[in-house]
Amino acid sequence: MQVILLERIAKLGQMGEVVKVRDGFARNYLLPTGKALRANAANKARFDAERSTLEARNLERKSEAQTVADVLNGKSFIVVRSAGETGQLYGSVAARDIIEALAAEGFTVSRNQVELNNPIKTIGLHNVTMHLHAEVEIAIEINVARSAEEAERQAKGESLTSADAIYGVDEDALRPEDFFDPDADRDGDDE
């Protein structure tokens, strides 16, 4: 089906372009959400008449997204999750969890604005890309940790996958030879 795009859509085209898309994509997404019109003479004339208002509305949305992007870009958010000693999470951090972390800080974004190809399954610092507008893209840092204190240590650059880092215990003191020496004489066992 041929459609006229009413706004820029990633991987599809710019506003005003006539593009060919699959019928289901047009009927189920583009047309109901008001992102496109069927490409016919009447709709082409309608688009030409409304072009300036559409461009103004798009510019307004872009400027709103840019103001949010200026505040959010490069900012770090902490997500606390349970994890094993190796740093593997018991579960994962998905786009929904990132949105909740942003909402806790007072930012409102939708799930489709977060670009997360696979859920986060390990503790550490992870960069996440967000598309606030078709032309506004930012990167935020998600700090996944077992606790808030651990997140602070992680942000300073410490590795948190050893027993010392997790529990504050020196791994060298946990060696078996320090507990038991088979060659040592036992006290009181002289024969």
Swiss-Prot record:
Q: What is this protein called?
A: Large ribosomal subunit protein bL9
Keywords, alphabetical: Ribonucleoprotein, Ribosomal protein, RNA-binding, rRNA-binding
One GO process term, biological-process aspect: translation
> Which N-terminal residues, if any, form the signal peptide?
none
Q: Which InterPro entries match?
A: Ribosomal_bL9 (IPR000244), Ribosomal_bL9/RNase_H1_N (IPR009027), Ribosomal_bL9_bac/chp (IPR020594), Ribosomal_bL9_C (IPR020069), Ribosomal_bL9_C_sf (IPR036791), Ribosomal_bL9_N (IPR020070), Ribosomal_bL9_N_sf (IPR036935)
Q: What does this protein do?
A: Binds to the 23S rRNA.
The family annotation for this protein states: Belongs to the bacterial ribosomal protein bL9 family.
Q: Where is this region: Disordered?
A: 150-191
A single GO molecular function term of this UniProt record: structural constituent of ribosome
Upper lineage ranks? Bacteria, Pseudomonadati, Pseudomonadota, Alphaproteobacteria, Hyphomicrobiales
Indicate whether rRNA-binding appears among the record's keywords.
Answer: yes
Q: Where is the composition biased (Acidic residues)?
A: 179-191
Q: Name one GO cellular component term.
A: ribonucleoprotein complex
